[in-house]
Amino acid sequence: MNLSTGIIFCFLILGVSSQRWGTFLKEAGQGAKDMWRAYQDMKEANYRGADKYFHARGNYDAARRGPGGAWAAKVISNARETIQGITDPLFKGMTRDQVREDSKADQFANEWGRSGKDPNHFRPAGLPDKY
């Protein structure tokens, strides 16, 4: 595939006008960093019941970057849920029904954050203010 075909393909797939592709990619990169930061904070906090808060917060922060950030948050969230659908039964001993319910709740929190709603709705009592 030559370069021009690749660029046109990206514009069609990403749904971005040629005038905004640079901004979109910048927002997507920043959104990916927001998602990574929320994931790192979740691991650091290691706080029972806080995972939905971090899902919502990562998506919220990323989506605030703009369309590119919202796109990155959705792609990352969907990929994460797909991977967890495979690994959770193997490594956490979860049943398919448990995985399905957890994924549904995670996706609800993801969409909550991406839609601009306050992620603190999912914040558990006692989670340190640092987060």
From Swiss-Prot:
Pfam families from the UniProt entry: SAA
Expressed in which tissues: Expressed in the liver. Expressed in mammary epithelial cells. Expressed at high levels in mammary ductal cells and vesicle engorged alveoli, but absent from stromal and connective tissue and leukocytes. Secreted into colostrum and mastitic milk (at protein level). Low expression levels, if any, in normal milk (at protein level).
Induction: Up-regulated by Gram-negative bacterial lipopolysaccharide (LPS) and the Gram-positive bacterial lipoteichoic acid (LTA) in mammary epithelial cells and to a lesser extent by prolactin/PRL.
Annotated phenotype, changing R64Q: In allele SAA3.2
Biased composition (Basic and acidic residues): 94-105
Domain of life: Eukaryota
Keywords carried by this UniProt record: Acute phase, HDL, Secreted, Signal
GO BP: any one term: acute-phase response
Ranges for region Disordered: 94-131
Compartment(s) where it occurs, according to its Swiss-Prot or TrEMBL record: Secreted
Disulfide bonds: none
Family: Belongs to the SAA family.
Function: Major acute phase reactant. Apolipoprotein of the HDL complex. May have a role in protection of the mammary gland during remodeling and infection. In vitro exhibits antimicrobial activity against Escherichia coli, Streptococcus uberis and Pseudomonas aeruginosa.
Protein name: Serum amyloid A-3 protein
Organism (species): Bos taurus (Bovine)
Classification of source organism: Eukaryota, Metazoa, Chordata, Craniata, Vertebrata
